[in-house]
Amino acid sequence: MPIALKEWAVTVRALAEGEQLITLRKGGIREPEKHFKLDHDRFFLYPTFDHQRNDLVRESHQPELRRALEEGVWNDGEPSVTAFRVEGGIQQPERVRIRAWAEVAGHFTISDPRCVDALSPFYVWTPDYAEKRLEWKRRHPLHVLLLRTYRIPRPVTVKVKDEYGVCSSWLELQRELPFEGTPVLSDGEFERAAEEIEGITREASQPLGQPVLV
């Protein structure tokens, strides 16, 4: 069965629109080894809502919070705008739409908050929230995944299962999905951005996987 990486719905949407190129990981409290481990080099992007908050998304992408609701299907209708204000304000829907997958083009670890700030053009969270990801589990470095994202030809709706709610990075989807589709950025656009990201992380990290520039 295909593997998916769990990420906020607004982040999944940004990745699928080419507005975000990286994700930052420390790992959930239910990770098998208690911290993040990159076990897969390509995976589908699974949207989550229950920890997503509007005050942790930068001002320029606030409108995307409402549009990100399209990634879920609620039997009782979409949640209200006020639900975005607190963590847990939006429950995970009955079903979610899988519309993109990603391959890892680079994997770095960093511990310098200045590097997190320098990477801010490549994510939609507030810089303060990104730094909080660094500070959590302080003894462990922050994993920076450079992702080449692809939109699948037609979004696929999958049923949300109880085991998907465990606080961990990965899940196994219970239906087959195609690793097909179009990259959200052209080869040239992605290569230029990847070179900039690699340059930012070079002095602050040791690359765990060399970027694959295509």
What is each stretch, according to the model?
Residues 1-214:
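Structured alpha/beta reader/binder surfaces that contact nucleic acids or chromatin modification marks
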